[in-house]
Amino acid sequence: MATTRKPRGGAGGATQPALDFDAPGEIVCGVDEAGRGPLAGPVVAAAVVLDPARPIVGLDDSKALSAKKRERLFDEIVAYALAYSVASASVEEIDSLNILHATMLAMKRAVEGLSVLPTLAKIDGNRCPMLAIRSEAIVGGDALVPSISAASILAKVTRDRMLVELHQQFPMYGFDAHAGYGTPQHLAALREHGPCEHHRRSFAPVREAFDLIR
């Protein structure tokens, strides 16, 4: 599990949109994940508490942004957020728990890694991990709630970077091009080379490729 976190000072006087702050004194963290669907690599989650005094322009669902915009916003989030935390669940955890429970585990780790204790976690999707604080699931939240948008960007960029590093070790799979998703290129490489230790053997295409070489 890789975790990064960042503390900052107190909040200023400006306000965020209503979706981010439900009541005076509420400290909201947005939570999102990247990497539920790929055949390889960890699932990564991020939690972000934005600073009302330092708004970040252009936040959106990471999937709606170009790679260049995600990288720029990643740097701004890291610089301006009150707190952020990025965590993951490993391929081994995905295979032993299943992808849903591994995703919930990564989200829990991200929230617990925050240096600022939130009072409410807003989670992208339709279910919440077990947390010690209140939580709210918001379908499509990564396009609606700025702190969830920020979390989606941190999770996506972090995971993409991880897969680029994996590509250096296993260039035959093309991880730098598809981030582990089941593209035709990736499936062809699986059939030709078989899976590596970073492939999720609980996922059917990987399991089938593994069976071919046994």
UniProtKB/Swiss-Prot annotation:
What organism, scientifically named, is this protein from?
A: Burkholderia mallei (strain ATCC 23344)
| Sequence similarity | Belongs to the RNase HII family.
Q: What is the lineage of its organism?
A: Bacteria, Pseudomonadati, Pseudomonadota, Betaproteobacteria, Burkholderiales
Record's protein name: Ribonuclease HII
Q: Which reaction does it catalyse?
A: Endonucleolytic cleavage to 5'-phosphomonoester
- Cofactor dependence: Mn(2+); Mg(2+)
Q: Which GO terms describe its cellular component?
A: cytoplasm; ribonuclease H2 complex
Where is this protein localized, as stated in its record? Cytoplasm
The EC designation for this entry is 3.1.26.4
Gene that produces this protein: rnhB
Main localization category:
cytoplasm
- Transmembrane annotation, as ranges: none
| A Gene Ontology molecular function term of the record | RNA-DNA hybrid ribonuclease activity
Matching entries from InterPro entries are given as: RNase_HII, RNase_HII/HIII, RNase_HII/HIII_dom, RNaseH-like_sf, RNaseH_sf
Q: Answer whether the UniProt record assigns the keyword Disulfide bond to this protein.
A: no
